[in-house]
UniProtKB/Swiss-Prot annotation:
Homodimer. It comes from the Bacteria. One of its GO terms (molecular function) is protein homodimerization activity. Residues 19-38 have a biased composition (Low complexity). This is Protein GrpE. The keyword Chaperone applies. Pfam families: GrpE. NCBIfam families: PRK14139.1 (NF010737), PRK14140.1 (NF010738), PRK14150.1 (NF010748). InterPro entries: GrpE, GrpE_coiled_coil, GrpE_head. HAMAP family: GrpE. Gene3D superfamilies: 3.90.20.20, Head domain of nucleotide exchange factor GrpE. GO terms for cellular component: cytosol. Residues 1-38 are annotated as: Disordered.
Amino acid sequence: MENTQENPTDQTTEETGREAQAAEPAAQAAENAAPAAEAALAEAQAKIAELQESFLRAKAETENVRRRAQDDVAKAHKFAIEGFAENLLPVLDSLEAAVGDTSGDLAKVREGVELTLRQLTSALEKGRVAALNPVGEKFDPHLHQAISMVPADQEPNTVVAVLQKGYTIADRVLRPALVTVAQPK
């Protein structure tokens, strides 16, 4: 009887040879792909390093801007009244001159006080401080403080007299005016 079946060893050798031939292009492709993958990896790592450096620079710049802003605010608070104080210096000079005057001339003293009052009023106006003199106006509890109510010929709740002026600075009340108000009839 003739052996029609091939030797199993021969078959395995042939399969191994075919597999080796088929694996060769795959191995070669893998070898070719490895440098490309390494290059892509190196490029990605370089990009990451660049982005990290850019992030750190941006973070440092943001911190510098924040610090400068804080310094500016601190300086603004520290020197906020500098201009106002400069406007008050002539008033101080006038008061010192009046104290140093020993002439005893009341007319001269009165004139000096009036001049000093004008200087002070001017300094306050430059600092946006405005006087409240609300005679004849309707009573406003935000601007006025009623001390008393008196019978008057004026409309009820109208300011009849100002006992002490009030003051505002840039539309904000520094001190309300002390007033007497017409009582309802």
